[in-house]
């Protein structure tokens, strides 16, 4: 099993090209099922979850051609299977996003209950309840969600009991082919949801309220394929910016989307960074200074993203002063904390809050990645640890970061993949 070895780094310097957003690419790949003609995506990252999504689409009978250079073509002309099996779904929660498209276009879907990162329950009941409101008959049996509808799904007025990115995406895709108007209230406003909506509109969907908490979808009878470019990955961007801040460096992120990162950029400025940006780039400069501790509280977009929480725990661990990091989205999302404590971090958990007293250096150690973003935080920690840090179980990293070691190497870090 692959591991990463990391040596203490000089300040990171240089430029890094940001990949397409995993959390936008996965639902957009599933949206390909809705299209009656060929669908071509670009800026798709080379990731394990993307590969799993392509396998799932092929398993259903779709033709999926990886054209190179981050381009994928999908044809559903011969799609004739409607079951997403456990073997594929168990490794990736986003597999649940095939449910809405299959049901909306073909009237039937059997989807195994999902797996993915072990960061809490993340129930699928919001997905199912919304689809039932649109006329679907659903039962959960022997580990599978079995959904059927006679004819087309029907437009409905859906109020989400809690904000859910995945449920918003599933219902948005289903509503695009429903009969009548669907209104989704308390919808997730994440940029990746907006990216999916823009893709659906390019396919012929009628959606208003994009980027707000109320989405209105006027269902159409059919959708066509299109060419669409996936948005840049704001979490990958934030990860590299935090790494630069922790190492007191100066970097430039190309192919970035500053507009989707206001909460993160504001906290980096609070930490003492000079942040400048253009339409598709962001520069961060620490001027050689140690960052200052910041207080973080995760919440749905446009507030601070839960997917950047672990990285900012490391920033606070190596900052001047004391910072508090409060997690409100997922339970059990501080699994990186015991590993960071093993590296010498001064951290204490009080319920959903981690209180962190900053120090100058950590100590290299063998640590274990427990989920995707925790993995990234351990890599950043290794850049400011004396000696060698060995990060085990990096298959989590490969689910969400494209060529992470080579990108860090391009910024001057000693991050090496070993068997």
Swiss-Prot record:
Major subcellular location class: cytoplasm
Location of 2-(S-cysteinyl)pyruvic acid O-phosphothioketal modifications: 117
One GO-annotated biological process of the protein: UDP-N-acetylgalactosamine biosynthetic process
Keyword Chloroplast part of the UniProt annotation: no
Membrane-spanning segments: none
One Pfam family in the UniProt entry: EPSP_synthase
Enzymatic class: transferase
Superkingdom in the source lineage: Bacteria
Alphabetically ordered keywords of this record: Cell cycle, Cell division, Cell shape, Cell wall biogenesis/degradation, Cytoplasm, Peptidoglycan synthesis, Pyruvate, Transferase
Residues where UDP-N-acetyl-alpha-D-glucosamine binds: 93, 307, 329
Cellular component, GO annotation: cytoplasm
Residues that coordinate or bind phosphoenolpyruvate: 22-23
Catalysis: reaction(s): phosphoenolpyruvate + UDP-N-acetyl-alpha-D-glucosamine = UDP-N-acetyl-3-O-(1-carboxyvinyl)-alpha-D-glucosamine + phosphate
Disulfide links within the chain: none
UniProt key word Cell wall biogenesis/degradation: yes
Localization of this protein: Cytoplasm
Pathway it works in: Cell wall biogenesis; peptidoglycan biosynthesis
This enzyme's EC code(s): 2.5.1.7
Active site: 117
MF-aspect GO terms: UDP-N-acetylglucosamine 1-carboxyvinyltransferase activity
Role according to the record: Cell wall formation. Adds enolpyruvyl to UDP-N-acetylglucosamine.
Similarity field: Belongs to the EPSP synthase family. MurA subfamily.
PANTHER family: UDP-N-ACETYLGLUCOSAMINE 1-CARBOXYVINYLTRANSFERASE
Protein name in the entry: UDP-N-acetylglucosamine 1-carboxyvinyltransferase
Organism of this sequence: Shewanella denitrificans (strain OS217 / ATCC BAA-1090 / DSM 15013)
Taxonomic lineage of the native organism: Bacteria, Pseudomonadati, Pseudomonadota, Gammaproteobacteria, Alteromonadales
Gene for this chain: murA
């Amino acid at each position: 099993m692959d591991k990463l070895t990391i040596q203490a780094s000089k300040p990171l310097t240089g430029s890094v090209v940001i990949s397409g957003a995993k959390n936008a690419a996965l639902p957009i790949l599933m949206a390909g099922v809705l299209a009656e003609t060929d669908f071509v995506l670009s800026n798709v990252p080379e990731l394990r979850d993307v590969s799993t999504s392509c396998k799932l689409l092929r398993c259903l009978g779709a033709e999926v051609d990886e054209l190179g250079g981050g381009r994928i073509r999908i044809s559903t002309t011969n799609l004739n299977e409607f079951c997403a099996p456990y073997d594929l779904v168990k490794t990736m929660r986003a597999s649940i996003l095939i449910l809405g498209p299959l049901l909306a276009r073909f009237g039937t879907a059997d989807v195994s209950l999902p797996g993915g990162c072990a960061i809490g329950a993340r129930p699928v009941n919001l997905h199912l309840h919304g689809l039932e409101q649109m006329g679907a008959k659903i039962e959960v049996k022997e580990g599978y969600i079995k959904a059927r509808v006679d004819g087309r799904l029907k437009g409905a007025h859906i109020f989400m009991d809690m904000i859910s990115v995945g449920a918003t995406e599933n219902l948005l895709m289903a509503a695009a082919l429903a009969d009548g108007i669907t209104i989704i209230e308390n919808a997730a406003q994440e940029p990746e949801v907006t990216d999916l909506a823009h893709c659906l509109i390019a396919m012929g969907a009628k959606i208003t309220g994009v980027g707000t908490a109320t989405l209105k979808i006027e269902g159409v009878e059919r959708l066509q394929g299109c060419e669409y470019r996936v948005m840049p990955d704001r979490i990958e961007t934030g990860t590299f910016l935090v790494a630069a801040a922790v190492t007191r460096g100066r970097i430039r992120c190309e192919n970035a989307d500053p507009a989707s990162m206001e909460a993160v950029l504001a906290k980096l400025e609070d930490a003492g960074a000079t942040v400048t940006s253009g339409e598709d780039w962001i520069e961060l400069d620490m001027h050689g200074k140690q960052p200052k501790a910041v207080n973080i509280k995760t919440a749905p977009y446009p507030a601070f993203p839960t997917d950047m929480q672990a990285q900012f725990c490391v920033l606070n661990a190596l900052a001047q002063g004391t910072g508090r990091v409060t997690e409100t989205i997922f339970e059990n999302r501080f699994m990186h904390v015991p590993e960071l404590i093993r590296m010498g971090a001064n951290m204490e958990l009080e319920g959903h809050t981690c209180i962190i007293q900053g120090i100058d250096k950590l100590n290299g150690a063998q640590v274990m990645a427990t989920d995707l973003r925790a993995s990234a935080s351990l890599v950043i920690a290794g850049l400011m640890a004396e000696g060698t840090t060995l990060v085990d179980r990096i298959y989590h990293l490969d689910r969400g970061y494209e060529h992470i070691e080579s990108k860090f190497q391009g910024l001057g870090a000693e991050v090496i993949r070993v068997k």
